[in-house]
């Protein structure tokens, strides 16, 4: 069996022309004899450093960092922080006598990847005063608490320490309310209950604005915590709309329960629910009086644009007006599920009509049902077929031909009458199906 590691260098240099730069780096780290591959192939130094950090190869890094400029070293710091390579960071920091390598990205990356020992080391080294925003984004209470304690380490009263530090930061950055306004809002936006609870426990007054970010986060426990500690659900549309955007059904139900908003006068709330695709919220709003029949079936068009077949089905069952535009949008964008929902619903309507006619001899057909059934006539299906063909939606065309075999004759006519369509579609794929 051939030992590939002992092939002559000339062979490896030749192989280097046929493999990726990252694979060359990996070869170099397997055996230091292959390091000449790196220089021979003129590989980007950042890629070499990146790979070396990933495998924690101190030898390669020490060999390269002496020739690396400040920006390159910052890159090494960031990548090492992300991968938790503490020894590499300490090795570089020892050579940084003028704080040239101060880089908040490295601190944020270490917090993001939860290598908090690296975060604390860098914060201490460069005497960072402001708590990095990533601690609030990722809910690293360890870092937040440690930095507060670090600000007033001689004070034995923890609650007093927190409040004094908050007041200090507020006074220092009052021009844009850097800490107190923005950072805790981030914790609310990302739904970190434990971080918000920490500030409440340490006598920080709760702001009404936090409730909006909590509704947006979709964390129901956080919303209840803030309401329990002074936030109020006013009867305004903005909070309801924010909760709907967040997409948590329990939060929306909770807000509706504690407010007196007339949803019949608030079509915007329904539009948001449809655009975000939350069928549960759509049903909830309807049960609370929200209108779905406004603007000649605008609801149906919005649902079709988003490709939400379950919402389209719900609207059909509730007899929302449906124009051909709904099917046109679905055909153009390739939303086969919406086409299927419509045809299935139309077939059910037709079956009901036929069964009643057989038993009673006649029946009064609802206008909505009559309209839906008429859309499925060949002429209207022809339109859907053309829209699908023009936009190369072969899956929809295939489905239509399966359900309506007579459309194949119409398809041939369309191809003959409109040769420009045949140029835009994959005919082989179509006829294969």
Curated annotation (Swiss-Prot):
The keyword Repeat applies. PROSITE patterns: ANK_REP_REGION, ANK_REPEAT. Transmembrane segments: none annotated. Pfam families: Ank_2 (PF12796). It comes from the Viruses. ANK repeats lie at residues 44-70, 71-101, 102-131, 179-205, 206-235, 237-264, 265-294, 296-321, 322-351, 380-409. Keywords: ANK repeat, Repeat. PANTHER family: ANKYRIN REPEAT-CONTAINING PROTEIN. This is Putative ankyrin repeat protein R784.
């Amino acid at each position: 069996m051939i030992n590939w590691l002992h092939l002559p260098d000339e062979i490896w240099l030749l192989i280097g022309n046929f493999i990726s730069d990252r694979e060359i780096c990996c070869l170099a780290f397997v055996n230091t004899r292959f390091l000449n591959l790196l220089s021979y192939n003129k590989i980007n130094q950042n890629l070499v450093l990146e790979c070396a950090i990933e495998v924690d190869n101190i030898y390669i890094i020490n060999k390269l960092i002496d020739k690396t400029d400040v920006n390159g070293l910052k890159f090494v710091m960031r990548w090492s922080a992300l991968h938790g390579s503490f020894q590499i960071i300490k090795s570089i920091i020892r050579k940084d006598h003028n704080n040239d390598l101060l880089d908040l990205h490295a601190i944020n990356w270490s917090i993001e990847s939860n290598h908090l020992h690296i975060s604390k080391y860098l914060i201490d080294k460069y005497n960072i005063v402001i708590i990095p925003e990533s601690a609030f984004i990722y809910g690293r209470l360890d870092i937040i608490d440690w930095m507060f304690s670090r600000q007033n380490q001689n004070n034995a009263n923890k609650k007093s320490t927190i409040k004094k530090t908050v007041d200090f930061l507020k006074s220092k950055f009052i021009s844009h309310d850097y800490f107190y306004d923005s950072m805790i809002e981030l914790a609310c936006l990302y739904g970190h209950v434990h971080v918000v609870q920490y500030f409440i426990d340490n006598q920080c007054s709760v702001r009404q604005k936090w409730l909006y970010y909590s509704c947006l986060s979709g964390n129901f426990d956080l919303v209840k915590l803030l309401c329990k500690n002074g936030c109020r659900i006013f009867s305004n549309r903005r909070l309801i709309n924010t909760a709907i955007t967040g997409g948590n059904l329990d939060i929306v139900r909770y807000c509706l329960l504690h407010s007196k908003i007339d949803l019949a006068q608030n079509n915007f709330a329904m539009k948001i629910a449809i655009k975000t695709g939350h069928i549960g919220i759509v049903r909830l709003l309807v049960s609370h009086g929200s209108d779905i029949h406004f603007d000649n079936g605008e609801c149906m068009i919005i649902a079709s644009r988003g490709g939400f077949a379950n919402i389209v089905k719900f609207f059909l069952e509730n007899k929302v007006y449906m124009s051909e535009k709904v099917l046109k949008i679905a055909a153009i964008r390739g939303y086969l599920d919406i086409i299927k929902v419509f045809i299935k619903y139309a077939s059910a309507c037709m079956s009901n009509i036929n069964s009643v006619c057989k038993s009673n001899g006649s029946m009064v057909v609802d206008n909505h049902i009559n309209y839906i059934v008429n859309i499925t006539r060949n002429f209207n299906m022809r339109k859907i077929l053309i829209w699908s063909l023009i936009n190369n939606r072969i899956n929809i065309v295939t489905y239509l031909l399966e359900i309506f075999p007579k459309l194949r004759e119409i398809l041939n006519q369309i191809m003959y009458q409109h040769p420009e369509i045949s140029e835009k579609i994959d005919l082989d794929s179509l006829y294969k199906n």
